Amino acid sequence: MNIANRLRKIDKTSTVFTISDIKTVLGINDSKSIYNALSYALNTKELYKISNGIYSYDQSYSRKEFGNKYRTPSYISLYTVLQEEGVVFQPYSSISVITNRSEKADIDGQEYIYRKIKDRILLNPLGINEKNGVNIATLERAICDKLYLDGLEYFDNTKNINWDLMIQLNSEVYSNNLNISKFISVYKK
């Protein structure tokens, strides 16, 4: 059975795999053996190489899933979530990711913007959901991230905000950040 079929059999939802994922599925610990297996899989087009150490079945992989696996720990947030949730109306084609190191990367035709945040915030799971192998912020967490990183800002649509969650996030994750507190006091109805 080829690598791609073994990956599909074990993990039916993921579209992006690290070398570590592949080692686990194949039960190979030897570096030379995994290199040979990956080389064969790439030559026979079983797998597609996205970036060093990260692979998919083909070019139709989840860009958000890749964004999470390219830098770990991380979660999708900021304008990616705000646009999808209808809080900002301006279109953004880049994928915004919160992690422990700031960086811009253009990989396989997709721009990724990684923003650094303190570990105590990054590693707190409140307001982060896992959907189809992707760690993604809730609307409220994305707003808090934006306010925490960039200061007060105008958002086009604040109707669907769960204000109780905003208050809880500010208290438990962001240590009562002044910008988040001001935003809540101005916009909470």
Language-model features: where?
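Short beta-edge/loop segments at beta->alpha junctions of small alpha/beta modules
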Residues: 1-73
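Nucleic-acid-binding surface
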Residues: 56-189
